[in-house]
Amino acid sequence: MKKRKIRYDRILLPILILCVIIFGISSCHKTEETKIQSKPIHTTTDFLKNALKPVGQTLYIYGGGWNEAQTGSGTEALTLGLSKEWKSFYDTQDNTYNYENYMYEIHKGLDCSGYVGWTIYNTLETKSKHGNGYVLKAEEMTKTFANMKLGSYKDSIQNAKPGDIVSMANAHVYIVLAVCEDGSLLIAHSSPPGVKISGTYDQNGNSNSQAVLYAKKIMKTYYPDWYSRYPDCTVDSR
């Protein structure tokens, strides 16, 4: 069987950048997906650095990042820096964690839109408790952010780039970290069990994609405790 040639020069650069970001210093199909391209008010690197801060230590909480009424940003999503309660709650759990046992315990972790909203707040704002924040329904994020002049809106994920925010029709939202040659995306998102790096299927619908392999390497290397509990790094974005 003929092996697929991988353009490592195109894939390893964003992965290298990602590894640098992880250490705190600074391209790897879905209908009805939309994205918002990052606007360079603050650099994409700033945005991705913030996106990685909760990774591997923040569990998925349905409603996490929202206020008590579930109408917008909660305290954590209006605060600069990580909430100490996220890591504390993570430390009390193990590989049997089930988010359904902690629904709406909003201070313990983040859901997908709470995570993206927190990341944007920590990138754009300079002080806590300023304004209304950026948490809203996942499927509405891309259009709303474009209307807020935070980026441009497209109704397709073709030509995705690192820093893009992608809203999915199934009420999920994620941040693109890198684009792989097989069409798969390396992403950061909050999805059960929590905030993690994952890889999407490739353009042919295969789950063993380049992005999935890179996600596993990154999580295993830089977040070993998380990976020992939650080794699944695959997300079906079709």
Where do the PLM segments sit?
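N-terminal capping segments
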Residues: E33-E125
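Low-complexity, Gly/Ser/Thr/Pro-rich intrinsically disordered linker/tail segments
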Residues: D202-R238
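N-terminal Sec-pathway targeting helices
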Residues: K2-P14
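C-terminal motif of bacterial Sec signal peptides marking the signal peptidase cleavage site
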Residues: G24-S27
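Hydrophobic membrane-insertion alpha-helices, especially the h-region
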Residues: P14-I22
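Bacterial signal peptide processing site
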Residues: H29-T31
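...with weaker cross-activation on analogous glycine-rich loops/strands in unrelated enzymes
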Residues: E125-G199
